[in-house]
A protein has these predicted regions:
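Conserved GNAT acetyl-CoA-binding A-motif
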Residues: 102-116
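A conserved beta-strand-loop-helix scaffold within acyl/acetyltransferase catalytic domains
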Residues: 8-84
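Terminal substrate-recognition subdomain of acyl/acetyltransferases
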Residues: 1, 6-8, 44-45, 114-165
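Conserved acetyl-CoA-binding loop-helix of GNAT-fold acetyltransferases
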Residues: 80, 90-102
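Short acidic (Asp/Glu) patches
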Residues: 64, 96-100, 130-134
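Short Gly/charged-rich anion-binding patches and loops
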Residues: 18, 99, 118
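Residue-level recognition of the GNAT/N-acetyltransferase active site
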Residues: 84-86, 116
Length: 165
């Protein structure tokens, strides 16, 4: 298994189609709306990440460089979004998360993700830590969003006014 990471400003249309093929499993929207969302919401510095087994795409996610105030210190994060597997329940998401954690460890990156309550246990299995909601302060309210971090010690407070990814 290996990661293929493509900066958004270098992605080819055929690679967008690969991403959409995996995303459609979790988010059943049409090809046009999926491509439109990616083009409209991703920035040049964002990255598309594919977990590959040989030539086969197993899973997909996005990484977005963002910042937040972590315990009073301006901190750079790699924001994890759109984690999805080509074959849900077969371990692709797990292997992708393990691989991205290894990548974060090797680069000394801090990870940040936002998720639904139902996904907290999944991410927790792979050393992502939930920040209690009362310790997270968004510039605009976001109900039902849970915040998790990777490669961060105990967080007393996160102030976040960057974009959602």
């Amino acid at each position: 298994m290996e990661l293929e990471i493509i900066k958004h400003n270098y992605i080819l249309f055929r690679d967008l189609l690969r991403a959409v093929a995996i995303k459609t499993v979790a988010w059943p929207h049409g090809l046009g709306s999926q491509v439109e969302w990616i083009v409209g919401n991703m920035r040049d510095e964002d990255e598309h990440v594919f977990l590959k087994d040989g030539n086969k795409d197993m899973a997909y996610m996005t990484l977005s460089p963002v910042t937040g105030l972590l315990d009073g210190v301006q901190t750079s994060f790699s924001g994890v979004g759109c984690v999805c597997s080509a074959n849900p329940g077969m371990g692709g998401g797990k292997l992708l998360l393990i691989s991205i954690n290894q990548y974060f460890d090797s680069e000394n990156y801090k990870g940040l993700l936002f998720c639904k309550k139902s996904l907290i246990n999944f991410y927790s299995k792979y050393n992502w830590k939930l920040i209690p909601p009362e310790r997270v302060h968004f510039s605009t309210p976001h109900e039902g969003v849970f915040t998790m971090v990777y490669n961060c010690e105990d967080v007393e407070r996160l102030e976040y006014d960057d974009r959602f990814f």
